[in-house]
Amino acid sequence: EFESTILGPSVPDLVALTNEALSISITQKKSIIDTTTIRYALHRKTWDLEADRNLSPAKEHGTLFYQVGRAFAHTVLLRNCSIDPISIYIKKNLCEAGDSSLYKWYFELGTSMKKLTILLYLLTCSAGSIAQDLLSPPGPDEQNLITSYGLVENDSDLVHGLSDIVHGLLELEGALVGSSPTEEEVEGTEEEVEGTEEEVEGTEEEVEGTEEEVEGTEDEEVEGTEEEVEGTEEEVEGTEEEVEGTEEEVEGTEEEVEGTEDEEVEGTEEEVEGTEEEVEGTEEEVEGTEEEVEGTEEEVEGTEEEVEGTEEEVEGTEKDSSQFDNDRVTLLLRPKPRNPLDIQRLIYQHQKYESELEEDDDDDEDVFAPQKMLEDLFSELVWSPRIWHPWDFLLDCEAEIPAEEIPEEEDELPEDALETEVAVWGVEEEGEADDEEDVLLEAQQEDELLEEEDEELDEEEDELDEEEEEPKEEEDELHEEEEEEEEEEEEEDELQENDSEFFRVKPIIPRHRWIFRKKKDVFEVLSYPEEATEISKELLRLLNPKTKRDAPKRPRQRWWTKKKQDKHYELLLDRQRWLITKRSLSKSNGFFRSNTPSESYQYLSNLFLSNRRLLDQMTKTFFRKMAFPG
């Protein structure tokens, strides 16, 4: 059936076709490769595969580059690590309190500067972004696909936060452990191991000498014991000879001789038995000495095992150093460990400064008293050389108050109103009647002008009501009405200018007897300096109004709001504490925080480029898996 099909001239083409058919059958979950599958595989191998590859969504490349960078970093740098930090970052539930293995792993990771650099960027998925930059740089209109996948919510904040953590770990390491092990320390460790081996050899020589002494002691004691036994036997033989001579000489006294023989023989036997017991005791001592020699040999063997373990540790340290020192990658420089005395001095200065601030606050309570601040405020604002425009206040008051309710006698005013008048306006009692008459005349003139204006407005309104019946003239009437209103506003402005010229002549502004009829207001002052500028602008607008609307509608309207002064002191203290903390940390942490991301990125980029062959192999593998899933 496939006779017309022309395959490649080599075996790899047939193998590729077989792999293609297998991948299609696995994808379609078929247990048997039929002719349709082979035809489809041949079709895919015959035609260009670019169109088929373009069928996959473009967003999968972000995940692909992330997987490539993660696998590469894990293969090259984290071969001996049992936990993947990227998985910990994505699955935050793994980081639970009380996990001793996780804590131990992170503690070991925190004691190495090189692994800290790796951890910093593995947690921020920089390995994937670096792989994406190296393999396919994004265009100007493309976005960061890795960030769009939600793996990192805010990369910059996380980088800076991890930089602070790394900096704290480095300071802790510098204070507790010191600098990282170098080649000199490794050489010193080797010298210590060699010295330990020499001590072990000397111990072996001592053990050999002890064995020789034990052997010599055994030989000497055994030989001496044998000589004593032989001498005892000779004595026994001599005694027997003497006994025989005694028998020959004294034949008549056999009973005595027998009794003597029995006594002497028994005594000699007891001596021989005692000598044998001494020999047995000597043999037991020799056995105990042999046991001590065996224990010494076991100690020597244990010492040799410790020496071998120390040599293995030294070899492992050399391997760890060579694993990173031979990759020609720029490393981060370790900051110098800080002196504990400097830290104590900084804490002492901070506490001393806080105590001084609290003492100053206690002393300044009288300075910031409300009455004192009230007097200072009026001395600066009220008596400042400004041009005042109080006609708006007067006109408002006269328009709202009927003439019948105005008191005729000055005695009706309360005493506190008079005190407020003198304190605020600074008007002396002399010449008050003349000033009041002038003010009343001016007010009457202004009332007449206002009445005339009101009459004119009423007449105009009547005319407009009559003309509303004509629909064609509505637009013209509206236009005329606007013009008339503008003219009225101009007339009012002219009147105000004339009044301002009148008031400029007088050095002291007269008071109005009705303004302070009621009790004086308690002026409450803001305690926040941030709002001082806004209050000053508001005061200028109220005291020098451009239009009538800007002026306060009531004479009792408050210009200040009440705030607690305690909050102001707390804000000052918090501000000073924040400044002290910022100054202390900016010197040591600013340089590290600003340079760590760029140096770490450069480190991993150089590492990727130095292992470009492995990176290409991983990239091809992931592309093949994406093109042929299953």
UniProtKB/Swiss-Prot annotation:
Annotated GO MF terms: ATP binding
Entry protein name: Protein Ycf2
Family that this chain belongs to: Belongs to the Ycf2 family.
Signal peptide segment: none
Key word Nucleotide-binding present: yes
Keywords: ATP-binding, Chloroplast, Nucleotide-binding, Plastid
Function according to Swiss-Prot or TrEMBL: Probable ATPase of unknown function. Its presence in a non-photosynthetic plant (Epifagus virginiana) and experiments in tobacco indicate that it has an essential function which is probably not related to photosynthesis.
The keyword Metal-binding appears for this protein: no
InterPro entries: Serralysin-like_metalloprot_C (IPR011049)
Organism: Oenothera villaricae (Evening primrose)
Bias (Basic and acidic residues) ranges: 316-328
Positions with biased composition (Acidic residues): 182-315, 403-419, 427-500
